[in-house]
């Protein structure tokens, strides 16, 4: 699982 990709998507959604 690519946590960096998931975190990036979450950060994009949060921002």
From Swiss-Prot:
This is Lasioglossin-3. The modification Lysine amide is found at residue 15. Belongs to the lasioglossin-like family. The keyword Isomerase does not apply. Its main location: secreted. Expressed by the venom gland. GO terms for molecular function: DNA binding. It is found in: Secreted. It comes from the Eukaryota. It comes from Lasioglossum laticeps (Bee). Keywords: Amidation, Antibiotic, Antimicrobial, DNA-binding, Secreted. GO terms for cellular component: extracellular region.
């Amino acid at each position: 699982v690519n946590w960096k990709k998931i975190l990036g998507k979450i950060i994009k959604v949060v921002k």
